[in-house]
């Protein structure tokens, strides 16, 4: 029969662990809400920028404009920007991004294309350093809710690589937020920008709410405004110069939104993992408590038998 003190200590240990996982779940839930607020806060700027670029596109037609960020070159080297986290305890979030990156690298190699890695997050850095992969730049210890200045620093690095023709294309691998229990690693081409113009598709903004004491996600369709400038509007500067200045800003905005979605995905994965850990801890406590009660009952029964046996011997 298990030792009573051992079982009692084990129960206390599991209870302490459950307190930690429950606290981590609540912290992650609060940070998911903050990530949502950041996405909403950047929407007015993103909408206005999309509107300006959309109208400039109609005025100029990108196919007739020669701009560095629109230049299509023969693809010899690709910069792959990989977004992971610095910490674990978030389910398969980091592993899924790394797995998708390995698949993309395999695809590039099969096409005879070289690649350079730009890594965000300690998990990606540790993984690819162990495999001696060609790492161009590493970024760790970013804010849990990425800021515009952090996105700008990374964006400048990518622009430098592309404009210097060190790489001919820039791809981004990040985790798209789908729900609190679902996310998907995706590959997106950042550079060069499409020559057919800038898309303004319907976007989905997620909102974390509580219903019946549980966290749920509401999704809202948001469309960027595309109302036109007056046709007789005169630009003080050459529209091409305006476009040349706004495209890097657009790239930075796209990168910021991808970083924010990745952060939300990581926090949601951590919240789900900690919720599952708390539930498992509760079940383990029940099992250990049952074992403890059985052992205690057996010990009491044994003592009674010994007392009765001693009395009979007298």
Swiss-Prot record:
Major site of localization recorded for this protein: membrane
NCBIfam families, sorted: ATPsyn_F1gamma, PRK05621.1-2
Keyword ATP-binding carried by entry: no
Matches recorded under SUPFAM superfamilies: ATP synthase (F1-ATPase), gamma subunit
Listed Pfam families: ATP-synt
GO molecular function, one term: ATP binding
Protein name, as recorded: ATP synthase gamma chain
Function: Produces ATP from ADP in the presence of a proton gradient across the membrane. The gamma chain is believed to be important in regulating ATPase activity and the flow of protons through the CF(0) complex.
Compartments where found: Cellular thylakoid membrane
Source organism of this protein record: Gloeothece citriformis (strain PCC 7424)
Taxonomic lineage of the native organism: Bacteria, Bacillati, Cyanobacteriota, Cyanophyceae, Oscillatoriophycideae
